[in-house]
Amino acid sequence: MANELTWHDVLAEEKQQPYFLNTLQTVASERQSGITVYPPQKDVFNAFRFTELGDVKVVILGQDPYHGPGQAHGLAFSVRPGIAIPPSLLNMYKELENTIPGFTRPGHGYLESWARQGVLLLNTVLTVRAGQAHSHASLGWETFTDKVISLINQHREGVVFLLWGSHAQKKGAIIDKQRHHVLKAPHPSPLSAHRGFFGCNHFVLANQWLEQRGEKPIDWMPVLPAESE
């Protein structure tokens, strides 16, 4: 069955492509030269570590990792416990408060509990230089994450794609809407959230879709690992 495939199964060949090896080499060279690159090396592929291919129910596409100290840890929109909640995630929490009964905004921005339920939190570029947004946008990560989206499209069925903002929507243009459920809205950034992200109801609609397919809905209340044990 397709859902038994792992990321390793479907990405092993891609990871041997010259462009990908060049990307890794460029990032490694920058780190070795003393440039601070986020997230830390051990966290770059966390989205795949926490959400196996066969478990993917929802895909949320981010763009660049956060470029401030201690923020990025390999999951789009998420920050480690103890780090201030970034504005886009605060707006996501506002939308959840307004649409999910009983949701109360947590005091942290750590979304690992979403990832472990099957929400792939995928940035389209997986590294960034400290303080320099989009500094790694042309390194080859976009080619890799295009492949990831293509593989989900091909090997899974009935996945909900939440595409916020023009970048994510262009990235998701290849998704087969007969096989998957695609929801679009403006980005939750303070610059655009009032243009239709607020009120998009995506978190509710995603769960309704999953329930219609007989799948367990996502508990959108982010819990820290110690709280969920």
Swiss-Prot record:
GO molecular function, one term: uracil DNA N-glycosylase activity
UniProt keyword DNA repair present: yes
Enzyme Commission code(s) on record: 3.2.2.27
Database matches in SMART domains: UDG, UreE_C
Hydrolase listed as a keyword: yes
Chief location category: cytoplasm
Source domain of life: Bacteria
Record's keyword terms, sorted: Cytoplasm, DNA damage, DNA repair, Hydrolase
Cellular component terms per the entry's GO annotation: cytoplasm
Biological process per Gene Ontology, one example term: base-excision repair, AP site formation via deaminated base removal
Reaction(s) catalysed (UniProt annotation): Hydrolyzes single-stranded DNA or mismatched double-stranded DNA and polynucleotides, releasing free uracil
NCBIfam families the UniProt entry points to: PRK05254.1-1 (NF003588), PRK05254.1-2 (NF003589), PRK05254.1-4 (NF003591), PRK05254.1-5 (NF003592), ung (TIGR00628)
Homology family: Belongs to the uracil-DNA glycosylase (UDG) superfamily. UNG family.
Function: Excises uracil residues from the DNA which can arise as a result of misincorporation of dUMP residues by DNA polymerase or due to deamination of cytosine.
Protein's recorded name: Uracil-DNA glycosylase
Taxonomic source organism: Escherichia fergusonii (strain ATCC 35469 / DSM 13698 / CCUG 18766 / IAM 14443 / JCM 21226 / LMG 7866 / NBRC 102419 / NCTC 12128 / CDC 0568-73)
